[in-house]
Amino acid sequence: MKNYLSFGMFALLFALTFGTVKPVQAIAGPEWLLGRPSVNNSQLVVSVAGTVEGTNQEISLKFFEIDLTSRPAQGGKTEQGLRPKSKPLATDKGAMSHKLEKADLLKAIQEQLIANVHSNDGYFEVIDFASDATITDRNGKVYFADRDDSVTLPTQPVQEFLLSGHVRVRPYRPKAVHNSAERVNVNYEVSFVSETGNLDFTPSLKEQYHLTTLAVGDSLSSQELAAIAQFILSKKHPDYIITKRDSSIVTHDNDIFRTILPMDQEFTYHIKDREQAYKANSKTGIEEKTNNTDLISEKYYILKKGEKPYDPFDRSHLKLFTIKYVDVDTKALLKSEQLLTASERNLDFRDLYDPRDKAKLLYNNLDAFGIMGYTLTGKVEDNHDDTNRIITVYMGKRPEGENASYHLAYDKDRYTEEEREVYSYLRDTGTPIPDNPKDK
């Protein structure tokens, strides 16, 4: 089997491919993967595990949500990739409900199962739901399947449903090929990530290119793919170079079982055998042979020319802080910790009950550590030496019945304006954070 491409052919390849084919936007991954659901839509939360057939082995899956309110476009899919059969419908009483097909649910679970697979040996195939698989609402009501294996869920009023239990799975084995593909269109997409976390680097949108057409068994090497990626990077970001490969994955004719190529060693990808693709002739309607498709998706780390690679063990850019929490009345030490941080911007108070403050380093209460009933007083001491910055936070007991976010420091009659100003720079109210004692 010959290697269809060689380094000597890159100039011709780029002239023929990149010079004449307009890039098209690539498909952006599994469509059913959602962020946090909107409170305005009814949701089915899928939280199941896999049981390997014939064994006691259990496979964990990340939970995901299905929006039961969105309507699919005609002939299209919902956001979760569910076909139009799984769609909202009106009942006899006029209330909206959603019909979920069993096959669609199993397909969504199958996609979730393989979403985080890192090797070709890690694939499992979903067979069916286990006997304990159940759909319930918040009140514990169980929803049973109809005779056609579908489940109809009400979507008004807005509510959440839970699919729990298990699905039966087995190790994936490719099916035998009976009619081998003749020609395979090889498409390519690549994305880049700055190795230093350089915020000035804005990665380009992932674009898809047609590289070439090969026969089953022809090959592409990792060196050739890296050279193609560097060519694309140089055209868009000439000041950057590739440092290492993060991932290389090949999708075969939209098959969810992809080929995962090694990321830590050189490789040669041989065009995979598969069934010949057919497409209906637009005029006659007769099924005719058409080229199959491989999509090679790669991700690389890059570095700006002249920059040093990131060293995970280099702490020279980090500053040491000692944080002490002290009872304002007894002067007893409540809690002490030492932190290394690259940014003094994070030296601000967080509320343990508010996840939006999770990047901040100081606490306005100590409830999470079992030290109950304390809050900020507004008195904060900030001391420096050659190697350490020591922050002492004085805390007092909050009034009975007040929640953990209550601040004694908000009582203007209790503390002087000078004391409040010392506290204010830690609350990011405008007073700059001093970099050294002389700036105070």
Curated annotation (Swiss-Prot):
Taxonomic superkingdom: Bacteria
Keywords assigned by UniProt, alphabetized: Plasminogen activation, Signal, Virulence
Region (Disordered): 72-94
Residues in the signal sequence: 1-26
InterPro entries from the UniProt entry: SAK, SAK/SK_sf, SK
GO CC aspect terms: extracellular region
Function: This protein is not a protease, but it activates plasminogen by complexing with it. As a potential virulence factor, it is thought to prevent the formation of effective fibrin barriers around the site of infection, thereby contributing to the invasiveness of the cells.
Name this polypeptide is given: Streptokinase
Organism, as annotated: Streptococcus pyogenes
